[in-house]
Amino acid sequence: MTTAAPSTRDTILVVARQRFADRGFSGTSLADIADEVGIRPPSLFHHFPSKVALYRAVLLDAFDDWFALMDETMAAEPAEGWPQVERVIRTAFRFFVERPDFVRLARWEALEGGPILVEELATVLRPLFERGAGFLEKEMDAGRVRRCDARRLVITGYGAVLSYLSDAPLVGSLLGEDPTSPVALETEQEHILDLFRHALVPGAPGPGPEPGVT
């Protein structure tokens, strides 16, 4: 059985996602998107009434993928304590590695303010944010993780994973290595997990020694 060819609308979204990820909203031309898709610019407006509408669809589609993955991850067992925290961090790290377009879109939106207002994006993200913070608070009450500011910890975790990848060129220059090599990615993931394990798990040993220190 042959796979159905993607619709014109789907093709527009794929091309637009890459363009917006590479150049941001302001630096992206609808004419360039239409040209790459292979349609005339006016035809694009049959599918999306404006550049803002197209950008909004691209951004919300990207975050829908993120929400679906987090829902699946947080529903897995065991759904408590450090094992759940570790699973969420590993899943987030893998998603960001596999979806560099998402990383760049998120950074462009944060930098530009974007035509999707920050308030709207915050409204979309809030249920997942509150779910994560609520989980941590429940685990603190049960004594399975150390007491901390759960809401700020969720933001810190998101930033720790996202920033390493969004700032990869700078990170590479500072560390003197390719930050996206398999070894570097594994090292960074374990480093982040080590820090959060030390911060959250009662009685956990301190972070491991720095490379080259015995």
Regions found by a protein language model. Name each.
Residues 60-65:
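Short, basic, alpha-helical segments at the C-terminal edge of helix-turn-helix-like DNA-binding modules
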Residues 97-119, 168-176:
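Amphipathic alpha-helical segments used for helix-helix packing
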